[in-house]
Each structure stands twice: as structure tokens, then as C-alpha cells.
């Protein structure tokens, strides 16, 4: 089971992504924030397996947020969710587990969840 963090400054999109997460049985908890700072505060006290991050946000961009998440919670897998495919090259420097383009399709999100679960399974077997 995965604990998922969603961060996007667009509230409608944030709600859509969180709703998609809640439909996936392998996700036990979904927390969503429209500001990176709020997400970081929450992460200080709560573990997270997967962070779904928008890249283009006003208070802190998703790339910076990802770096901070990796410092606070090193085991958290990062998946960037954005409407701007040109950010893909910059995002790969963070070594994300994946990259989803908006609007996010249920099957694409499920594919990312399955991939993260396979990584967790591999870690346990090692």
C-alpha cells in the first residue's frame, strides 16, 4: 500500500489527481496541497511513498520541491505531473520515478503506481 502526496497550485487539477488516486486500491492514503510550503510542513511529520508534483508553481517550482522532499524523506518516489512537456529534460536531473502529462489519465497513473510497487517489492527482496 502506498501513501501519496499530491502538490499542484491549480485546485481543480489537484482535486482531479487526488480523486484518481483514491480510485486506486493500492493507495492507502492521499494528501493534497496547493502550495509547496504546506506540503513540506506536512512531510516533516508524515512518511510518504510517492509524491505527484506539478513543476510550474508560483511559490516554489516542483523541481526545487522534489529536491527538498528527497532531503526530508529520501525514500519518497517523485513523479512529475505537468502540462508542459518541455520541462521533462530538467526534471530528469532529479531522477524521478516517472513523468505524467496533464490531463492525467487513470491508466497512466495506475501504471506509475504499479511501477512504484514493483520498486518496493524489489527492495524488500534484496
Per-region residue spans from a language model:
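Acidic catalytic/metal-coordinating carboxylates
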Residues: 35, 61-64
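Short amphipathic alpha-helix used as the core "switch/output" element in two-component signaling
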Residues: 41, 63-74
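Receiver (REC) domain active-site loop signature in two-component systems and cognate sites
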Residues: 55-57
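C-terminal output helix
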Residues: 104-115
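Acidic, metal-coordinating helix/loop segments flanking the phosphotransfer/catalytic sites
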Residues: 32-50
Amino acid at each position: 500500500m502506498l501513501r501519496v502526496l499530491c502538490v499542484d497550485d491549480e485546485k481543480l487539477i489537484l482535486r482531479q489527481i487526488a480523486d484518481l488516486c483514491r480510485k486506486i486500491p493500492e493507495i492507502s492514503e492521499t494528501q493534497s496541497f496547493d502550495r509547496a510550503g504546506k506540503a513540506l510542513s506536512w512531510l516533516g511529520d508524515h512518511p510518504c511513498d510517492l509524491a505527484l508534483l506539478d513543476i510550474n508553481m508560483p511559490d516554489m517550482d516542483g523541481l526545487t520541491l522534489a529536491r527538498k522532499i528527497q532531503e526530508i524523506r529520501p525514500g519518497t518516489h517523485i513523479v512529475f505531473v505537468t502540462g508542459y512537456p518541455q520541462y521533462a529534460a530538467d526534471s530528469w536531473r532529479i531522477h524521478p520515478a516517472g513523468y505524467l502529462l496533464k490531463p492525467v489519465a487513470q491508466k497512466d497513473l495506475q501504471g506509475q503506481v504499479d511501477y512504484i510497487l514493483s520498486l518496493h517489492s524489489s527492495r524488500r527482496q534484496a
